[in-house]
Amino acid sequence: MHNQYGSLFSITTWGESHGPSIGVVIDGCPAGLPLAPEDFLPAMKRRRPGQLHTSPRQETDSVTILSGVYQQKTTGTPISLLIQNEDASSTSYEQLNDCYRPGHAQFAYEGKYGFADNRGGGRSSARETAARVAAGVVAKKILSSQGIKTLAFLSGFGPLENKTYPKLTDPLIRKVYSSPFYTILSQEEIQNLLLHDPEDSFGGIVSFITSPLPIGLGEPVFGKLPALLAAGMMSIPATKGFEIGEGFASAHMTGSTYLDSFIAKEGEISFQTNRCGGTLGGISIGQPLEGRVAFKPTSSIRKPCPSVSKDGEPITYKTPKQGRHDPCVAIRAVTVVEAMLDLTLVDLLLQHRCAKL
C-alpha cells in the first residue's frame, strides 16, 4: 500500500475504520511551531460524524499528541497523532463475508490482496480521512504563520450547483467554522432533496479557495501545483473529478475569452481575471488559488441493488437498517479537501525555499 503523501513535508496515515484507533505521523514540520491538543478541536468538529446531514456514528475525534511536541512547541522530529475509534459497530457488515457491495472497494481489495477487511470498509473507509484533517491542522498553522489563508466549502449537492468563488475574508472563515453545515447553496433545497428520497444518496462538489499565494509555489515539470493538488484530492475516498479555475469549462472557450489579461496596478503587475485559477505553468502567480473537487453519491444506500455472491450467484443487496452512512459524502469531505490543500501548499512552500540560494 502507498500510505504516504508529500515530500519535504509528508504524512503517513494508518489504521482502519473499525480498528481500535487511527492516526498519522507527520515528518518535516519545522521546530518551534506552537501546537497544543486544543488546536485540533475546530477542524475535527467540522469533520466529525453525528451532525446535520451526516452519518449517525458518534466519534469525539479527540487528538492525542504522542511525539514531536514539547512544552506545546514542535521539536522538528516526527509528530505522531492518535485518534481513538469509539463508536465502531461491525454487526451490519457480517453478511459481506459472502457477497459484494456495489460501488465499494471490497471487490478491488480482494482482487489485489486476496483478502479484505469488510468492517466499515477497513482501510478504504473515509474514516481514515480524520487523520488527514488532524495533519492538516499542523499544515494550516504553518501557512498562517506565512500569511496564507485557505478555505473549502460545499458548492454542489445533487442537481444543485453554485460555481462562484467568494473572496476569502476573515469574516467568511469565521462564518464557515461556526456553522454546523455551511454551504453557498440553499439549505432548504438540500433538505427537500433529502426528504424526497431518504433511501437514496447524492453526489456533491467541494470548492476551495486561498488568499493570494506567493509567486513560485509549484515545481516544473512533474511537481506542478495543480498536478500535486490533483493527486492529493483524488486520493480522498469517493472523489471522481478535479479542476483548477475554469477547469473543464475552459475546453468550450476561445482564447480571447479565456486568457487572463495582465494589468499594472499601483506599480505592480497583476491580472484582470483569474480564469486560470491562480497558476501558470503549474506555478502560483500571486493570485488566489481556486478549484473544485467532485464526489460521487454515497455507495451505501437503502434501495435494493443487483449484486452477486462470492460464488457468482445473483443476489439483491440492500444496506442493513443498522448501517450508518452519510447521505452525501461531500458534506464532511469539505474539511478533508481543505486539509489536502493545506498539506500540499506547505510541502510546496518548503520546496520553494530550497529552489534558489
Swiss-Prot record:
Catalysed reactions listed for this entry: 5-O-(1-carboxyvinyl)-3-phosphoshikimate = chorismate + phosphate
GO biological process, one term: aromatic amino acid family biosynthetic process
Pathway as given in its UniProt record: Metabolic intermediate biosynthesis; chorismate biosynthesis; chorismate from D-erythrose 4-phosphate and phosphoenolpyruvate: step 7/7
One Pfam family per UniProt: Chorismate_synt
Function per UniProt: This reaction introduces a second double bond into the aromatic ring system.
Summary of subunit composition and partner proteins: Homotetramer.
Name of the molecule in the record: Chorismate synthase
Species lineage: Bacteria, Pseudomonadati, Chlamydiota, Chlamydiia, Chlamydiales
